[in-house]
A protein has these predicted regions:
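Short catalytic/metal-binding and nucleic-acid-binding patches
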Residues: 1-188
Length: 188
């Protein structure tokens, strides 16, 4: 039985459809990006983030985006967290772990009537609304989030605990402080 999901979603420009390390896309929708390669569909459930790749090519592809890639400031990340609180209150989600990084988010979410992708959509919408309401997002033409999310179902208590540890430690991998969010519920 599914106990929870580990979901990862990126800000606009974080992980492109033709990302050299692979993506979950089957097409490249922007003509200007096609010169950097076709979609790099993978089916792996393991993280590919640390796979060796041509960083210069990846950064050049990001330069071809319609808008600059999004990287949250610390204040913006706090507003994203405030938006998450509103979504959690709206739908009674239980969050076991959260890391809001400059260009992506990791969450461990308890099983819910809504599918993980619907939950992510709700969280993104509330976070975006909070960024705008706080005056922290001025460019209404520039998207905040990438289109997709990645979700891994966790069906054992061991898997849930492992995912929680991974999410809690994730900021440290980027030289950031550990994060403590008021909306996170301890997993028993």
């Amino acid at each position: 039985m599914i106990l929870a999901s580990h979901v990862i979603f990126g800000t606009y420009g974080f992980w492109l459809p033709n990302e050299p390390r692979g993506s979950w896309s089957d097409f490249v929708g922007r003509w200007e990006l096609t010169r950097f390669g076709k979609a790099t569909t993978v089916t792996s459930h393991r993280s590919l983030a640390r796979v060796a790749h041509d960083r210069a090519l990846r950064e050049a592809a990001k330069e071809a985006l319609l808008h600059p890639p999004v990287r949250f400031t610390g204040v913006q990340a706090l507003a994203v967290g405030q938006g998450f609180i509103k979504a959690i209150e709206d739908a009674s989600y239980t969050i076991f772990a959260c890391a809001i990084l400059p260009d992506h988010v990791h969450l461990v979410v308890c099983r819910h009537a809504r599918k993980p992708r619907k939950i992510v959509g709700h969280l993104k919408a509330r976070a975006t609304r909070q960024l705008k309401a706080s005056g922290l997002w001025q460019d209404l033409e520039r998207p905040v989030w990438g289109l997709r999310a990645w979700a891994v179902y966790l069906d054992t208590r061991f898997d849930v605990r492992r995912a929680i540890r991974y999410v809690e430690r994730n900021p440290g991998k980027e030289g950031k402080a550990l994060q403590r969010w008021s909306f996170v519920t301890p997993f028993d």
